[in-house]
Amino acid sequence: MKYLQFLAAVAAVSAFSGPVLAGSSVENTNQVLPVQLTGALFSQVANGQHAERAIKVDNSAQFVPVQGTIAALSAVLNEQKAGKRSFSVENTNQVLPIDVIIAGLSQVLTEQKAAKRDNIVKNTNQILPIEATIAALSAIANGQKAATKRSTAVDNSSQFIPIQGTLAAFSNVLNSQKATKRNTGKVVDNTNQVVPIQGTLAALSTVLNEQKASKRGVDVDNSSQTLPIEATIAALSTIANGQQAGKRNAPDFDVVKNSNQVLPIQATAALLSQIANGQSVEKRNAPDFDVVKNSNQVLPIQATAALLSQIANGQSVEKRNAPDFDVVKNSNQVLPIQATAALLSQIANGQSVEKRNAPDFDVVKNSNQVLPIQATAALLSQIANGQSVEKRNAPDFDSVKNSNQVVPIQATAALLSAVKNLQSVERNAPDFDSVKNSNQVVPIQATAALLSQIANGQSVEKRNAPDFDSVKNSNQVVPIQGTAALLSVVGNGQSVSKRHEGENNIVDNTNQVIPIQATIAALSTLLNSQKAERSYSVDNTNQVLPIEATLAAFSSVLNSQKAERSYSVENDNEVVPVDLVAAALSQVANGQKVTRRGETKESIKHNVNQVAPAQASLSALSDIVNSAHSRRAMDVKQYETLQYAINALQQALDKTNTGDKTHHVDAMTGTAEHFDERDAGLDPAAFLGSAASGISVPVGNKDLLKSLVKRYAAEEDEAMAKRTPSLNGRGQRPRPRNSSSSEHNNNGQCSVGEAKCCSQVITDEGKKKTLAGLLGFNNLVGDIGLNCQQIPVLGVSLQSICKATPVCCTNVSQDGLVNVGCTSIPIN
């Protein structure tokens, strides 16, 4: 899989990557390994995210994180859409995360929508997208509305309410996201809820942030509602941070009394001085039960201080055991708490929590409540922020006593000085009589922001549940989010991936992963849009759609994300590497590509999953485009594999939204649209196709390039003249034979690239970097050939044909003036 490493190569000042690995020999394992690291200075910014999944069960687990971002001195529009459909599958999991983001001196509009439907599955699991962002120096309004969902013919209905909130700019900015979920099954006695989260903004003027959520259940014994949450903060600059957590139970079980909960967390602080904000969560097992020993409790904690003076904000959590039950003694309570205030003038921040017991049941007397958390404000004027969450008991069950709750999470920090924000969550489920099931959630978050440096990291570890007697089931969700911002523009995004491993037909369970979003902006224009669509018709499908979008600072900016998946079932193997780069006043490049390969075995020929590759575009104050790919010397097989991926991208240009099982998506149209406006004589499709393969890129300063080539060529000739003279009096150019860096083929053949006869070959690292910078390359493998001509025939007559230096070059630019990625050809 070396070509994956190549596809993940990025162009910018620095790069960050970290592997996310999952085991392959466990019957049932659910991991969530989100990784996020973001730093921002006035010079450099790095942002990366990784996602990996391994699966070998009859169940499908999808993960579709989305990240989008923009900023500019002019109008910017950023849209992301993700759609996924499943046909003829017993169990289907869809994820429709969406995110988008903005900032600029003019109006910006961004919308996100997420919808999911399940038509053939008894039980449906969904995941809520998240949105969070920013603030400005003028008035900012942020509203969130939650969609209404009704269930008509099911004993129990599963709904969730989307979230919206956030905008920022020197003028008006609107950012919204919607999510709806419907459950059409009629045989499910189980309830799954997911609570979305929203957090955002502040300014020097009045800021209003509201969220409303309503849900109704029709013709159902019980109605499950979920109320979203909103939290915000503000400083003198732009700050946005949001994170969401959701977890849902697998389909109905015959003899399983199981309960799965997810911990919400909230922490936040802001002020002109240092602020420390931490929160921890602990879960205790409920008392012993007669029939089922199952109890899930969550005790989140929040503390925050902020102000030019001292501010102390604490929150306490109490948990009460549910009443005695006739058949099942099971109690699930979650009592989160949040409170916080900070500002030079008046700040009001309140949150209330109420818990109500569900109505009496004939068979099961069970009560499940979820109490949301929220609180936080900071600003030179007034800020009000509140969030509430309510959840009611699931209906009666004939054979299953089960209840699932999900609590959202939000955390944010910002200030002109140091800011630190930590949050941890840990939960262990008790032992069960008939089912040994354990659910752990260990999210971690840390964030700091200064006037110069910003570091944001998050790690998540998940442990495998113990062996099960009758059901091997384990569901974990670990959302995390943390973020910080400078006096200038800083964005932070993070994604979460979840993996499920197990033998086929052992688990009929579904695992979900929570996407996370954050965002950014720069002094120049950035447009980043990404689309993803999937279609499949197999019993099991695994997709990973990581997306990352960009940022820009006063200097170079690097932003990359990678996603890798591998699993050992008769399923398609996809690779979704993503890369994008953005630069500041001089260079801005943003690109991301997604390639995917389907297995060709006869038994799974019908299983072809395509991932709509992401689109990223560029636009800067100078005419420089930076290709995010650089070739490396590779063998024939590797080259063919790479070329296959490149061809797949190019073929997708004219196949958009076909809607068939082998779904093709236009990979580069969005980018190509913008080249027509900037370069009238440029063929966008041809340019992007070439740039994708790293063959040629336009040069911002051609005169400077030609001048340097002329000078370097003269210096190389002068150095050659000082070497051992040849018969014609000129220096004899070296011709290495079978060196470690040369092509290992007989008769001077090139396994990769084209054979060139170059008058000069630049090996000096300093000169190579200078030329590479002008060409738009950041990472080069091999040397650079100058004044080269193609060699028509290789082999025995090579010496007579090429009087200069024969090389194999993988990248050609500027009509042979400069050839990149050159390696010497051994002459026999």
Curated annotation (Swiss-Prot):
InterPro entries: Hydrophobin
CDD domains associated with the record: hydrophobin_I
Entry's localization field: Secreted; Secreted, Cell wall
Keyword Ubl conjugation: no
Post-translational modification note: Hum3 is an atypical hydrophobin that consists in a repetitive repellent-like region that spans 578 aa which is separated from a hydrophobin-like domain by a spacer region containing three possible kex2 processing sites. The repetitive region contains 17 amphipathic repeats of 31-36 aa each of them with a C-terminal putative kex2 processing motif.
GO molecular function terms attached to this record: structural constituent of cell wall
This protein's UniProt keywords: Cell wall, Cell wall biogenesis/degradation, Cleavage on pair of basic residues, Disulfide bond, Glycoprotein, Secreted, Signal
Phenotype upon gene inactivation: Does not significantly affect surface hydrophobicity. Leads to complete loss of pathogenicity when rsp1 is also deleted.
SMART domains assigned to the protein according to its UniProt record, in alphabetical order: HYDRO
Signal sequence interval, chain numbering: 1-22
Cytoplasm listed as a keyword: no
Glycosylation: residue positions: N156, N222, N738, N811
Disulphide-bonded residues: C750-C808, C757-C802, C758-C788, C809-C822
Superkingdom of the organism of origin: Eukaryota
Protein family according to the UniProt entry: In the C-terminal section; belongs to the fungal hydrophobin family.
Task of the protein: Aerial growth, conidiation, and dispersal of filamentous fungi in the environment rely upon a capability of their secreting small amphipathic proteins called hydrophobins (HPBs) with low sequence identity. Class I can self-assemble into an outermost layer of rodlet bundles on aerial cell surfaces, conferring cellular hydrophobicity that supports fungal growth, development and dispersal; whereas Class II form highly ordered films at water-air interfaces through intermolecular interactions but contribute nothing to the rodlet structure.
Additional note from the record: Filamentous ascomycetes and basidiomycetes generally contain multiple hydrophobin genes. In contrast, hydrophobin genes are absent in the genomes of the yeasts Cryptococcus neoformans, Saccharomyces cerevisiae, Schizosaccharomyces pombe, Kluyveromyces lactis and Yarrowia lipolytica, and the dimorphic fungus Candida albicans. These organisms have probably lost their hydrophobin genes during evolution. Mycosarcoma maydis does have hydrophobin genes but the encoded proteins have been functionally replaced, at least partially, by the repellents.
Subunit structure as annotated in this protein's UniProt entry: Self-assembles to form functional amyloid fibrils called rodlets. Self-assembly into fibrillar rodlets occurs spontaneously at hydrophobic:hydrophilic interfaces and the rodlets further associate laterally to form amphipathic monolayers.
Protein name according to UniProt: Class I hydrophobin hum3
Source organism (scientific name): Mycosarcoma maydis (Corn smut fungus)
Gene label: him3
